[in-house]
Amino acid sequence: MLDESLLDAPEALARADRRDLLRGAAEAGARVRTAARHAAEAGIGGLNPEGRPRAVLVAGPGTAASGVADLIGALAGAAAPVTRIHPTGVAPAPGALHWTLPGWAGSVDLLLIATADGSEPGLALLAEQAYRRGCTVVAVAPTRSPLREAVDGVHGLVVPMAAAPHGEYDAETSAAGPGTLWALLTPLLALLDRVGLVTAPAEELQKVADR
């Protein structure tokens, strides 16, 4: 239960909500709208896929990427298997994380990359590996990030991640917040709607943002 008296005491609220979840939840609707717009501007709505992917692979660091994989798996159901590629390495050091495609992954599979950081060299290497195998690669990452520069138009498509409406706050806490989750998930839902794995047309995403 939320102690409503905290809403009039910013310092006490900050102590009680150290992960900034309340602010993240409040900003989630705006980030869904922005993320949906970014997906449209990236050309997601104009894609005409030839069929469904055999499998969907999801990669990215932290709890937000894990949440994205879990939600996509739940929404896709039996339409296609959804597998999260777990990183190896030292979690607090993004440069030390590595991701490897399963041996069976190939041209009929879809790799989704979700990162609120975008500085992980291991994700760029994963995208390159997937490109060589013939996988379709779509990523959501910050606009100015090494991952976007390495992948977009070279090894796949990158949709810019929707930033927090009033600028980023504590990166360590915001990366696990609801706003970040929706910023990463929304463009991927738009994509999966186009390939027929989930039902998430633009008007439905707008309804989600309005709730």
Where are these regions (language model features)?
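Generic structural signal of hydrophobic/aromatic residues within well-ordered alpha-helices
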Residues: 13, 44, 205-208
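Glycine-rich phosphate-binding loops that contact phosphosugars or nucleotide phosphates
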Residues: 51-210
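Cofactor-/ligand-binding subdomain signature composed of acidic, glycine-rich
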Residues: 1-41
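Glycine-rich phosphate/diphosphate-binding loops that line cofactor/substrate pockets in enzymes
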Residues: 41-53
